């Protein structure tokens, strides 16, 4: 959702927020000079190819990281059409490996209700943002394997958002965390399942 970035920029702690750039789809936000300038000024966007991260993007990211900046990236490469997550692409993992930096996984719950893809006006709703522990690529780990590990970490955070920390940790340890992409069923059943998940998130009360 286009609501993700504004919410994250107001939720990330100050020491990192003021040195944070947003990796934005080059083909969408930087299609012309005007839109690129607006994105850069409004949210601190920098262009990233979402289909295949090239050497130019990798070198730019490395230079920014070396200068002390953090980069917010969306590993799915685009917005969800129905509110469920999508499979992670390897671009974010590739950049993390090239830059030799840790990745902090973040899960956002409910932003699709605020501003779903195709909608122009936001509407009030409740969201949950869950931050995980930093992850570092293992020695010799390739981008695809690291991306899978990042996706599993975000799935565990999504489980925590609808249950509790202890149960989510147990399922993550057992490898049984609910997937981000939702059930492989018809469209109406996916919509119902997403609504049920959101209702559980709204009813949840943290134990600490």
Say what each PLM segment does.
Residues 55-208:
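Non-catalytic C-terminal accessory region of glycerolipid acyltransferases
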